[in-house]
Amino acid sequence: MTSLFFDHALLPEGWARDVRMVLHDGTIASIEQGAAPQAEDIRHPVALPGLANLHSHAFQRAMAGLTEVRGPAGDSFWTWRDLMYRFVDRMDPDDIAAIAAQAYVEMLESGFTRVGEFHYLHHAADGAPYANPAETSLAIMAAAAESGIGLTLLPVFYAWSGFGAQAPSAGQRR
């Protein structure tokens, strides 16, 4: 049993003061408003419901630092996108799962409890489908399950590359 005490907590009925929350095996067992703090309580100033990250591309977590500094004067979103596609060409489902698991743990540590994962890496680097068409989706789902974050998988399909009905680029065929 774990006992948490909050000076302020946002509960379903609104804000409350002096709230004790008792957890059993990670599940909320009871909530008491207007409580007095006890010696065994772990104290916190504020409690909020878990937040949802509504727009994630977890694999991009591994790119941190690669595009933080602008390059030549002609650098733009499109040059960033080209780098991203070159980067993902080196990833396999195991890489995707490992990177997503790291990103999801970092989200949990930051207060997110759910993630909407925009997932568009469906094929091998050469654009060929995996034997199991859901291979990379299963990797994302395994990462979410391993980390403990709630997942809404949002599969993405590229019919066109940019504007003007251009065929998808090599990176978009993944």
Enumerate the language-model features and the residues they cover.
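C-terminal helical cap
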Residues: 7-10, 103, 107, 118
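Short, acidic/polar
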Residues: 95-106, 139
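N-terminal metal-binding scaffold of metallo-dependent hydrolase/deaminase domains
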Residues: 1-36, 46-47
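Divalent metal-coordination and catalytic microenvironments
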Residues: 7, 26, 44, 55, ...
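Residues that scaffold the ATP/ADP-binding catalytic core of kinase and kinase-like folds
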Residues: 31, 61-62
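Active-site gating loops and adjacent loop-to-helix segments of metal-dependent hydrolytic enzymes
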Residues: 62-98, 124-133, 160-174
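Histidine/acidic-residue-rich, glycine-tolerant segments that coordinate divalent metal ions
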Residues: 106, 112-174
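Histidine-centered catalytic micro-motifs
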Residues: 49-61
